[in-house]
Amino acid sequence: MKLSKEISAFCDRIGHRFDRPELLVRALTHASRSTAGRSDNQRLEFLGDRVLGLVMAEALLEADPQAREGQLAPRYNALVRKETCAEVAREIGLGDVLRLGRSEMLTGGRRKDALLGDGMEAVIAAVYRDAGFEAAKALILRLWGKRIGAVEADARDPKTALQEWAQARGLPPPAYIESARSGPDHAPVFTISARLETGACAEAQAGSKRQAEQAAAKALLAQVESNHD
């Protein structure tokens, strides 16, 4: 199978040449594009999630031999969660080569965390199936390397951390309100306000509601923690 120039360039970016290029094509094919004769990337995404998890668990153990399980778990979760996979996918331009159906094309599928994260995991599995575990491990460590060393000991996602902060003080969970939406349908920008019962609030913008909520939660958490220092 001959790959397009765009997908060949993507291979260069991730540093892997496929002996079985059909694996990569499948990894890049979303369910909205699949047909009866051509499968999508869901099965590869399932496998890639497990390969990523094993590599991250081992990398964290090696990076901090003295860390306890309770310290490792939040770091691990921060490294393998869908938002992180989507961030890595954006860094390597994976969205540019995703094979999407018309419905996803019209609704900005190339920018969605869910599609990018799933695609990243599917690409990991494609490398694993093409060249084995060591090749997949090398890819993951190359793409995630800076994150492994920088991940915080308290690496809960901001929404979880903010909710736990509120609960510890007898407050109800924070509310997230979409205050504005701008941009075209294929590239929307969401403005989300995170608010506590105390009246404290913070606002953030992002290309998806999930990203905007996380960013608003992070800003509000920093605000309330600073005020209570």
UniProtKB/Swiss-Prot annotation:
SUPFAM superfamilies: dsRNA-binding domain-like, RNase III domain-like. Signal peptide: none annotated. Residues 7-132 form the RNase III domain. InterPro entries: dsRBD_dom, RNase_III, RNase_III_dom, RNase_III_sf. Mg(2+) binds at residues 45, 118, 121. Gene3D superfamilies: 3.30.160.20, Ribonuclease III domain. One of its GO terms (cellular component) is cytoplasm. GO terms for biological process: mRNA processing; regulation of gene expression; rRNA processing; tRNA processing. Its cofactor is Mg(2+). The keyword Magnesium applies. It catalyses: Endonucleolytic cleavage to 5'-phosphomonoester. It comes from the Bacteria. Its main location: cytoplasm. Its EC number is 3.1.26.3. The active site is at 49, 121. Keywords: Cytoplasm, Endonuclease, Hydrolase, Magnesium, Metal-binding, mRNA processing, Nuclease, RNA-binding, rRNA processing, rRNA-binding, tRNA processing. Residues 157-226 form the DRBM domain. One of its GO terms (molecular function) is double-stranded RNA binding. Belongs to the ribonuclease III family. Digests double-stranded RNA. Involved in the processing of primary rRNA transcript to yield the immediate precursors to the large and small rRNAs (23S and 16S). Processes some mRNAs, and tRNAs when they are encoded in the rRNA operon. Processes pre-crRNA and tracrRNA of type II CRISPR loci if present in the organism. This is Ribonuclease 3. It comes from Dinoroseobacter shibae (strain DSM 16493 / NCIMB 14021 / DFL 12). The gene is rnc.
